[in-house]
């Protein structure tokens, strides 16, 4: 089957923002204007198409990235048809993983900002993630109809807080209740959308007299930004004082693709104004898969390899999300980077070294689906029937193997015990948690060997609340949850601490003999960056002359690695330690892998105790937005929680307080902040780093452990 849309007319982009910027409403309007959705869904009434999980509709926040395919031929229907694959991403910090995984497979992003709130703490987190993957992006300043809306202020914040070279493509006509439309700086015309048709029709008018000077100045700034793309454009601009519409677009596009500039649009998704022109901007300014560099990976011989975004190249794709669907079972969302795949084809998963047959291929439209026969380079789709694929795995052609770079997922910082309410929930709970962990790599499940309890770990309280909620709704499992527990770590402060341990048992028959001498030191920053570091632990073999035979060295390392999973202080994982194997001895008959494993384990425990062991606690970067009236109470409370204030900023809702606070002090903070501020203050937090816990905390944790 021939390709219906050339790859140059594909746009794979994400819609990103902080909570309450109006991201889901913006996505809804996109679906409405591209003809996918015949009725506009509102978040207020829980009918939004993109927020398809029950909990999302109840809580009014987006949790999982829903992928949708739509088509666009321009606001005035004059463009050739473009194919959009849109991914809606959550804005809550506990779901940063969803943003991260969608960024990995996108070519561009639309950054939605609130015209009142501007650049929020969460915006900075999302922006940093987009920088990490060099994602070209444009901004849409939403909610221009709201009281306090200020387009210029948000553009300034983009520059000051995010370091973006923001280039307005429009200026708003009016603001708040008086917001009427926008001035298109390319055409130097005012755009007015028709209210009766919900914005599906529009007309160009002359620019209002009071905006002519503002628009002229803004246009000069835009043209200058375009001219800086190349010497030819700059020469023409300097000689003639202007550029054609086509030249401006080509210069701006070139610079957007290089992530040098961020074009800025504005509107009110809720009032059906502005999203339409922003979609034209997606076509003009964001990349197609063919504009992005070829995807990089490693071939069978561990050599670097690339795949160009063409249908004729060997097939390669990245599985970026696994979901459990009530009707079809497990769905694997994947992005095709090169080649073609037909339903029924076999694919190879080099990460698991397994072949799998792709059953059905589904094109997803939020929670509706359409079955398709094939996918090609640039497509995003979902496969049914893949059993062993996990998030971040590569799928490729069996005869041309490539392993694409895996995704890096953050370590969970909070844990809690869960237990089934009834015997019949017991079995179902294990299956439910297994499925949910397969879907979400930032969520972990383990069994505590001593207590036999099931421990779940995640990125924050909300994250774990929603997991427990999903168990109930999707798997009918009722569970009791314990108090959240902090994921502490253990490490040492003293360097070059020697520990000598001989494991010897000789009581007739074959004995056991393993003898090791190790040196423990804290890892340096340099060492932490080395390729040999795994799980934040470095093993160095300094044995020469066969004092310990080569075949026993891996057993020594294995013994050490097994021991660091549960540290000697309170049973938390050991991090940041380098162990050097410096000496030892062996017995021709009695030495075995097990004996050396045990010797290494005991030597480590004894050495750790002598090396000034300390407990580390996770420190969270917390941003609190509070009205001035409550500032004293809020800041006093931060100090009581052992918080360190990092500074303050102004915000339309009062003051933004930045602080570093230990996670152990943050449980139940949402409730106490609400009561302190009569529900008017908000906060967001993300993990920042580990640091040494004070002695009283370490003692309390040790006693509990």
From Swiss-Prot:
Pfam family, one: EFG_IV
Annotated protein name in UniProt: Elongation factor G
Binding-site residues, GTP: 17-24, 88-92, 142-145
Gene: fusA
Keywords from the UniProt entry: Cytoplasm, Elongation factor, GTP-binding, Nucleotide-binding, Protein biosynthesis
SMART domains recorded: EFG_C, EFG_IV
Protein family according to the UniProt entry: Belongs to the TRAFAC class translation factor GTPase superfamily. Classic translation factor GTPase family. EF-G/EF-2 subfamily.
Species the sequence originates in: Xanthomonas axonopodis pv. citri (strain 306)
Localisation per UniProt entry: Cytoplasm
The keyword Nucleotide-binding belongs to this UniProt entry's keyword annotation: yes
């Amino acid at each position: 089957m021939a390709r219906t849309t050339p790859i140059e007319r594909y746009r794979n982009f994400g819609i990103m923002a902080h909570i309450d910027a109006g991201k889901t409403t913006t996505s809804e309007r996109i679906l409405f204007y591209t003809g996918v959705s015949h009725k506009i869904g509102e978040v207020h009434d829980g009918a939004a198409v993109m927020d398809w999980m029950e909990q999302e509709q109840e809580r009014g926040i987006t949790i999982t990235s829903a992928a949708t395919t739509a088509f666009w031929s321009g606001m005035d229907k004059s463009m050739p048809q473009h194919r959009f694959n849109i991914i809606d991403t959550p804005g809550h910090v506990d779901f940063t993983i969803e943003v991260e995984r969608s960024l990995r497979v996108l070519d561009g992003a639309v950054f939605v900002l609130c015209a009142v709130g501007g650049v929020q703490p969460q915006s900075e987190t999302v922006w940093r993630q987009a920088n990490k993957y060099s994602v070209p992006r444009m901004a849409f300043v939403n909610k221009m109809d709201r009281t306090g809306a200020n387009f210029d202020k948000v553009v300034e914040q983009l520059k000051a807080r995010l370091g973006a070279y923001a280039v307005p493509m429009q200026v708003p006509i009016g603001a708040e209740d008086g917001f009427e439309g926008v001035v298109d700086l390319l055409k130097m015309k005012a755009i007015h959308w028709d209210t009766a048709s919900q914005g599906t029709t529009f007309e160009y008018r002359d620019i209002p007299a009071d905006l002519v000077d503002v628009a002229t100045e803004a246009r000069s700034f835009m043209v200058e930004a375009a001219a800086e793309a190349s010497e030819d454009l700059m020469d023409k601009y300097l000689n003639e004082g202007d550029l054609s519409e086509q030249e401006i677009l080509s210069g701006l596009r070139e610079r957007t693709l290089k992530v040098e500039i961020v074009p800025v649009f504005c509107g009110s998704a809720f009032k059906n104004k502005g999203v339409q022109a922003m979609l034209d901007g997606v076509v003009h300014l964001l990349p197609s898969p063919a504009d992005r560099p070829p995807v990089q990976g490693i071939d069978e011989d561990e050599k670097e390899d690339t795949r160009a975004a063409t249908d004729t190249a060997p097939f390669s794709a990245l599985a970026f999300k696994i979901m459990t669907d009530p009707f079809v079972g497990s769905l694997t969302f994947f992005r095709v980077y090169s080649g073609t795949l037909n339903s029924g084809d076999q694919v190879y998963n080099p990460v698991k070294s397994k072949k799998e047959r792709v059953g059905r291929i589904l094109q997803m439209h939020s929670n509706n689906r359409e079955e398709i026969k094939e996918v090609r380079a640039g497509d995003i789709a979902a496969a049914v029937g893949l059993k062993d694929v996990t998030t971040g795995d590569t799928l490729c052609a069996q005869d041309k193997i490539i392993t694409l770079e895996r995704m890096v997922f953050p370590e969970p910082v909070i844990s809690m015990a869960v237990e089934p309410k009834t015997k019949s929930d017991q079995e179902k709970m294990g299956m439910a948690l297994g499925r949910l962990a397969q879907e979400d790599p930032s969520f972990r499940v383990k069994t505590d060997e001593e207590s036999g309890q099931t421990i779940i770990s995640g990125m924050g309280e909300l994250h774990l609340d929603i997991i427990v909620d999903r168990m109930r709704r999707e798997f009918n499992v009722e569970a009791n949850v314990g108090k959240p527990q902090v994921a502490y770590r253990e490490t040492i402060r003293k360097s070059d601490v020697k520990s000598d341990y001989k494991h010897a048992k000789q009581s007739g028959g074959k004995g056991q003999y393993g003898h090791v001498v190790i040196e423990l030191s804290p890892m340096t920053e340099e060492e932490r960056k080395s390729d040999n570091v795994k799980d934040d632990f470095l093993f160095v073999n300094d044995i020469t002359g066969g004092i310990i035979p080569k075949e026993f060295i891996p057993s020594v390392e294995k013994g050490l690695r097994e021991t660091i999973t549960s540290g000697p202080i309170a049973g938390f994982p050991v991090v940041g330690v380098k162990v050097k194997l410096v000496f030892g001895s062996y017995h021709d008959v009695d030495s075995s892998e097990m004996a050396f494993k045990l010797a290494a384990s005991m030597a480590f425990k004894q050495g750790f105790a002598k090396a000034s062991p300390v407990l580390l606690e996770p420190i969270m970067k917390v941003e609190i937005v509070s009205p001035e009236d409550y500032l004293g109470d809020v800041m006093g409370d931060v100090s009581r929680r052992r918080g360190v204030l990092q500074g303050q900023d102004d915000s339309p809702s009062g003051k933004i307080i930045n602080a570093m606070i230990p996670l152990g002090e943050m449980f139940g903070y949402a409730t106490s902040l609400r009561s302190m501020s009569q529900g008017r203050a908000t906060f967001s937090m993300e993990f920042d780093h580990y640091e040494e816990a004070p002695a009283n905390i370490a003692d309390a944790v040790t006693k509990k452990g």
